[in-house]
């Protein structure tokens, strides 16, 4: 008799401890999963699961290529990228493609090439996905043992982990090679307002690179998000790439130690939960990085950070009122503190007013005006350059505070424009998606642990409480 639900609904997780189960196909009867449960039907069909993953990669790369070309088609060179709702072109520009001094776009052809290459790649991946999903072998273990696996085979799993780590390491080194040999990357700190340059003097000192990991995440410390020069970023990628590649080789050559065999759950769903947990961490870190860091995410392309827009406003009005005759060094604000300048808790001269909370901002347009004790009064009086005024006035009206209906900037700012900052989009999306992935991690970890411990999985469908309740209609 065909039941609407399967008694083996949660059975798949148990297959590790029961080698007798042979899956006949991809229907609910044989797998315990309906069509909408997606890849759960393919847990023991390595060939079909490969097809699903390759097809998924094809969709991802297709989106990248199509969205890339969409942004190129809509791009207006006269407007800054962050006013145009772009999220892909800023990444390409940061890598040094198509831009010149000050972050000005001088050539959109590299962006077009990037989009076309991704589209072509997606076609190859799409074909591979369809082939393995429909035509290729259901399982790889017999015909292609190198690509086959059994989820509970701990040695094979760490070998696969090692291969992934090596690929990640190669990815890190691709950025290093781009910065060192293939035209360089965009440096927002280059003198005169940012430029593309080759990174020649890498930071390889372990005390500096790993010092970032030991910093506090709060305030002026800012953990790894506080990195503010490209030498450290590219040097960090050398370290990271090396660690990933060496760790990958280690995991390929070794078998898991006894403590790891005991401590971890060795099932497909457990690996899924570990991966989701890692991606959640990545999402939360990426959120903080794109929101606060204006070196890895230059303000020329992504718009100013929140603290940067706030400090820019204070600077803009300091410039205006100083021209009108105000003595910015001694003017008193409504609270009795300095109106334009005041001292930080540690004694540096900082901007006064509400922006005092952002006193540890560092930005390329502001740093030339600092001395050994914070902002230098004589420089503020004599050395402010027109490009600094222009940059700060522009950033002041482009605070990353937009709402979904595109009323951008500070709500009370009469010069604000209809705009939502890419920083807002990227930070919010990565936080929200990171949170979803974290919930998925908890869900799948709980199921994997329950299966490993032999708990009852799910409620008994024959005596479900809802069956004894009055129908809604």
Curated annotation (Swiss-Prot):
GO molecular function: chlorophyll binding; electron transporter, transferring electrons within the cyclic electron transport pathway of photosynthesis activity; metal ion binding
Protein's membrane topology: Multi-pass membrane protein
Pfam families membership: PSII (PF00421)
Cofactor annotation comment: Binds multiple chlorophylls and provides some of the ligands for the Ca-4Mn-5O cluster of the oxygen-evolving complex. It may also provide a ligand for a Cl- that is required for oxygen evolution. PSII binds additional chlorophylls, carotenoids and specific lipids.
Keyword Secreted listed: no
GO cellular component: chloroplast thylakoid membrane; photosystem II
GO biological process: photosynthetic electron transport in photosystem II
Annotated InterPro entries: PS_antenna-like (IPR000932), PS_II_antenna-like_sf (IPR036001), PSII_PsbC (IPR005869), PSII_PsbC_sf (IPR044900)
Residue numbers carrying Phosphothreonine: 15
Main subcellular location: plastid
Function, as annotated: One of the components of the core complex of photosystem II (PSII). It binds chlorophyll and helps catalyze the primary light-induced photochemical processes of PSII. PSII is a light-driven water:plastoquinone oxidoreductase, using light energy to abstract electrons from H(2)O, generating O(2) and a proton gradient subsequently used for ATP formation.
Protein's UniProt name: Photosystem II CP43 reaction center protein
Originating species: Solanum lycopersicum (Tomato)
This protein's encoding gene: psbC
């Amino acid at each position: 008799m065909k039941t609407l639900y399967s008694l083996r609904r949660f059975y798949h997780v148990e297959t590790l401890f029961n080698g007798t189960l042979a899956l006949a196909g991809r229907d609910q009867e044989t797998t315990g999963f309906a069509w909408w449960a997606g890849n759960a039907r393919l847990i023991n069909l390595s060939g079909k699961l490969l097809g699903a993953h390759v097809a998924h990669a094809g969709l991802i790369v297709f989106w990248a290529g199509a969205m890339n070309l969409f942004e190129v088609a809509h791009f207006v060179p006269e407007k800054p990228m962050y006013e145009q709702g772009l999220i892909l072109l800023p990444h390409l520009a940061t890598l040094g493609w198509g831009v010149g001094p000050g972050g000005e776009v001088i050539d959109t052809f590299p962006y077009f090439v990037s989009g076309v290459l991704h589209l072509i790649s997606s076609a190859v991946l799409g074909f591979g996905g369809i082939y393995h999903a429909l035509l290729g072998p259901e399982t790889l273990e017999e015909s292609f043992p190198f690509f086959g696996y059994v989820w509970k085979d701990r040695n094979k799993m760490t070998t696969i982990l090692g291969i992934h780590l090596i690929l990640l390491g190669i990815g890190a080194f691709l950025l290093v090679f781009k910065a060192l040999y293939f035209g360089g990357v965009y440096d927002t700190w280059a003198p005169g307002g940012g430029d593309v340059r080759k990174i020649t003097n890498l930071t390889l000192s372990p005390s500096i690179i790993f010092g970032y990991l030991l910093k506090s995440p709060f305030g002026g410390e800012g953990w790894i998000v506080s990195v503010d020069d490209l030498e450290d970023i590219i040097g960090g990628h050398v370290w990271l790439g090396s660690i990933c590649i060496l760790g990958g080789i280690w995991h390929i050559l070794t078998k898991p130690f006894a403590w790891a065999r005991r401590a971890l759950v060795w099932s497909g769903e457990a690996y899924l939960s570990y991966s989701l947990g890692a991606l959640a961490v990545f999402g939360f870190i990426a959120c903080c990085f794109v929101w606060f860091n204006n070196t890895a995410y230059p303000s020329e392309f992504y718009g100013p950070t929140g603290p940067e827009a706030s400090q820019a406003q204070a600077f803009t009005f300091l410039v205006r009122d100083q021209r009108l005759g105000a003595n910015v060094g001694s003017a008193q604000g409504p609270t009795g503190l300095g109106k334009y300048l005041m001292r930080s808790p540690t004694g540096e001269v900082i901007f006064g007013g509400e922006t005092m909370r952002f006193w540890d901002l560092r930005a390329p347009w502001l740093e030339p005006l600092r001395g050994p004790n914070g902002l230098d009064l004589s420089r503020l009086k004599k050395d402010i350059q027109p490009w600094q005024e222009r940059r700060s006035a522009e950033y002041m009206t482009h605070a990353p505070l937009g709402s979904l209906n595109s009323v951008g900037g500070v709500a009370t700012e009469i010069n604000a424009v209809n705009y939502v900052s890419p920083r807002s989009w990227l930070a919010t999306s990565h936080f929200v998606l990171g949170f979803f992935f974290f919930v998925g991690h908890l869900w799948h970890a709980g199921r994997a642990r329950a299966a490993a411990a032999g708990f009852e999985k799910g409620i008994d469908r024959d005596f479900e409480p809802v069956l004894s309740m009055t129908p809604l209609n």
